[in-house]
Amino acid sequence: MKKLLLASAAAALIGVLAPHAAMAQATVKPGSAVDMVLLPKFLGIAVFDQAHNGAEEAAKELKNSKKLQYLGPTPENSVAGQIEIVTNAATQGVGAIMISNNSGDQIVPAAKAAHAKGIKVVTWDSPIPSAEGEDVFVAQVDFAETGKVMADMALSILGAEGGSFAVLSASPDAANQNAWIAAMQTALKDPKYAKLKLAGIVYGNDQSETSYNQALALVDKYKDLKLIMAPTTVGIVSAAKAMQDENLCGKIKVSGLGLPSEMVAYTKNGCAPQFALWSFVDLGYLSYYTAYGLATGAIKAEAGQSFKAGRMGTYTITKDPTRKEGLRILMGPFSKYDINNVEAAAK
């Protein structure tokens, strides 16, 4: 009788634990023909072109006979353009859409419509805030970490005396930018950042001229400004150029997220002493592997699912801790640049 009870208890325990057991690592097999769309926030941005190169590398590796469609809206029509591209892709019946979302939750109806047709929807760089209509988000780095890195760079540049700084962001609808800034504001509550004062936030819409003008407007508005923090590769270059053109690099520094190849001159002349970024080539590569694996059925969009993504190694899908809902694949890592390593990284 005791053995029977023990056996029953063991069976019940297995029944409880089974759904939470680790999933077997998925094998993403090459050779399937899958129509896929890579959708950046908009065209004409260097980091998105790098992501495209990474996706093409993965496509070649996976021997997908279907040509990758790299489609994007114009900067002036980014939100409506992204929605239109997703809607058209769904009508075409593609296998997977990879979106760097610049539309907030406005893209949800189009994403849900695509998802309802069996199309796999992977976001990269910037997720759908509510996660509705999305299978998984491929995150370049942890968003909370991004905020802390920004706060740390501000502290390092401004030193013990601290001072006033402002943020030059991309667009108000960019989920990634908003999350990074919110994380930075949370980090700034730590007493060690007590002497850093966030004066304000402006948006350059990832347009060079607009960002340049917004940087100068910050200088005019905040007379005690010591630093412009730009978590956008377009914004940081534009702000650095504006400070250089106005001979303000000795008074106002620039930092944020930038490409070494675009920032090397500004780091060497002292306008932008520190900045950070990750590999967009790797981000495009991993996003393609993820979307292809989902579309071919090799990968399940479930927490605990792991898979090998070619040269980048093994990744695991988890619940996204930065959103109330949604799944995430965390890529990483951050790279920080200064006068000691920027030239080598720029080559």
Residue ranges and their predicted role:
Residues 29-31, 82, 138-164, 210-212, ...:
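Hydrophobic alpha-helical segments within soluble ligand-binding/sensing domains
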Residues 26-33, 172, 176, 288-347:
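Hinge/cleft segment of the Venus flytrap/periplasmic-binding protein
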Residues 87-90, 96-116, 184, 200, ...:
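Hydrophobic alpha-helical
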Residues 109-145, 156, 164, 260-268, ...:
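Flexible loop/hinge segments that line or gate small-molecule binding clefts
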Residues 28-58, 62, 69-83, 100-104, ...:
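Extracytoplasmic "Venus flytrap"
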Residues 61-75, 164-167, 189-206:
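Short beta-strand elements in bilobed, periplasmic/extracellular small-molecule ligand-binding domains
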Residues 47-62, 146-150, 175-195, 210, ...:
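Short, solvent-exposed amphipathic alpha-helices that sit
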Residues 1-35, 91, 112-119, 343-347:
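Short, low-complexity disordered leader/linker segments with a strong preference
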